[in-house]
């Protein structure tokens, strides 16, 4: 509903964000008749209506930063089935060159090196298993934490990969301090909404964004956590709340 209010003649594309690994409703965004760019930086390996992210939107962008579900030293990637977008991406990543030394747009040196590509190729077969473990941990959290904090919802048609498991509670700062006292790391991601930053300053009210920024806390969720680790984290949050 909010997206429909923003569509105008100047709209060139819609960017849907798969926040924390939860796939956005791409088909709903497609209904507006403008290209959809899917920000899948946090959802590598996720599914939407049984399809992998990367083959749903007009253009999909991935991050391979070291903390991501599929990671190397920090490069990124973009995939598309449209030749016109592919041509632009290839130019942008190579100083804007359409061919060698023929520069006809502003671009960057954004080519992935072979070493990082090799690392990603070797890690790719493990991605589904890693994501499965993240979902299993999320299931453990959900089973108990829903009585103490607001737990993350999974979008309809999305198969969440839990790049982050983010709880919501009005006392997240106190919870975070208590967890740290127990040797458990947590993090307040995006404590300042985009519309309140200097660059994107907007005087309008975005109540959902402001609520999430004020009350969200990410707790550990990765494939190397043991069941005992997860139980300890659950018990610490119960004690903190």
Question: At which residue positions do the language-model features occur?
Answer:
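Active-site phosphate-binding strand-loop segment of PLP-dependent enzymes
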Residues: 1-72, 78-83, 218
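PLP-dependent aminotransferase class I/II
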Residues: 5, 13-17, 47, 84-241
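Conserved beta-strand and immediately adjacent loop positions that scaffold enzyme active sites
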Residues: 76-77, 164
């Amino acid at each position: 509903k909010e997206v429909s209010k923003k569509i105008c003649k100047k709209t060139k594309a819609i960017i849907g964000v798969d926040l924390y690994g939860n796939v956005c409703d791409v088909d709903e965004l497609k209904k507006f008749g403008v290209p959809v760019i899917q920000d899948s930086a946090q959802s590598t390996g996720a599914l939407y209506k049984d399809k992998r992210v990367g083959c749903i939107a007009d253009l999909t962008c991935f991050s391979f930063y070291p903390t991501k579900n599929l990671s190397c030293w920090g490069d990124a990637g973009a995939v598309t089935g449209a030749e016109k977008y592919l041509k632009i991406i290839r130019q942008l990543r190579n100083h804007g060159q359409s061919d060698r030394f023929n520069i006809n747009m502003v671009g960057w040196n954004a080519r992935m090196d072979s070493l990082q590509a090799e690392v990603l190729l070797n890690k790719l077969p493990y991605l589904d298993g890693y994501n499965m473990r993240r979902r299993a941990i999320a299931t453990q959290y959900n089973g108990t934490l829903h009585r103490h904090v607001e737990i993350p919802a999974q979008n309809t048609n999305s198969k969440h990969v839990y790049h982050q498991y983010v709880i919501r509670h009005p006392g997240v700062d106190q919870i975070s301090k208590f967890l740290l006292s127990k040797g458990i790391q947590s993090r307040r991601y995006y404590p300042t909404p985009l519309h309140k930053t200097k660059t994107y300053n907007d005087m309008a009210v975005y109540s959902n964004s402001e609520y999430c920024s004020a009350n969200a806390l990410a707790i550990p969720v990765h494939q190397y956590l043991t069941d005992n680790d997860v139980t300890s984290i659950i018990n610490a949050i119960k004690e903190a709340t």
